[in-house]
């Protein structure tokens, strides 16, 4: 098999993804990154008292790989808002990693007050373990997805391999970087984006789609366990000709390192990526943090929360904010998981479960 799988364990405190961090960091992939943000020092509040009676409340947001900058900004703003409105200090801890790995951590006992993961299937997996209600997606607007993204290609300045669309990723001599769909939610969006393109190109032929996607993955040089790790491999380590990436991650790379180093190629057809959010009922009931946790997620839908999402290159749901940032996001023909794959449950079972299509294509 022409690629290696990079898997590491451990945790570090996350640093802001600045230009210095990109160029000087070790690039080690981590299963969890923890950031303390908000006002005041971290104070444990894990007890059964109601959060409304506490002067300081601590939340843990377990999120997927590329949301570090988003929630670093959002947590500070939410803490200020909540302090002014309710007189409480809120400290938010962040844990980041591949979405699938993060979901398993919550299932295994990581006490997340809220989860903000890459795809609904990962939160459904937590729900199946009775940690939150089955109808969790109905609690907030837009199926509990306050912002969206899509999948694009990041190439080096001048686009030396002439990458224009998904077909170019199958060509001999093109080195592709993408994360491992067994551990990364972003990687599953990447994979289904390629599969959906192939279906539309080849009159819905599953065999042709399998052949097409298989050829892309034959060109993959490294499969990191998460989207940020894949970005580090491409951007910092200089490996690969093209990175299949979240749009927000590609735009952030340009912002941090400059358009003189990288270009973004938007494919003719891509997938509507909808990363959802949810309160983990079992944890907030135990800790007495339900009111704050619910307010935290609701604030994502506020105009200020939507502004923060847009500034961090996520496509906002709010029409007013979306119009303001329209020039930032190119128009692209999008399809959904429901339209082409019958929903995440079917897509997961067919493609990513043990023994599924991905394993069939890449077993040694």
Model-derived segments and their meaning:
Residues 202-268:
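Ligand-binding pocket segment of bilobal, Venus flytrap-like solute-binding proteins
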Residues 158-164, 183, 196-204, 283-291:
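Short helix-loop capping/hinge motifs at secondary-structure junctions, enriched
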Residues 152-154, 263, 276-278:
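Residues embedded in well-ordered beta-strands
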Residues 75-84, 107-111, 120, 127-131, ...:
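Sec-exported extracytoplasmic/periplasmic mature domains
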Residues 68-73, 182-211:
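Bilobed "Venus flytrap"/periplasmic-binding protein-like clamshell domains
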Residues 1-58:
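Short, low-complexity disordered leader/linker segments with a strong preference
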Residues 50-183, 326, 362-363:
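N-terminal segment of the mature folded domain
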Residues 284-364:
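Extracellular/periplasmic juxtamembrane helices and adjacent flexible linkers that interface
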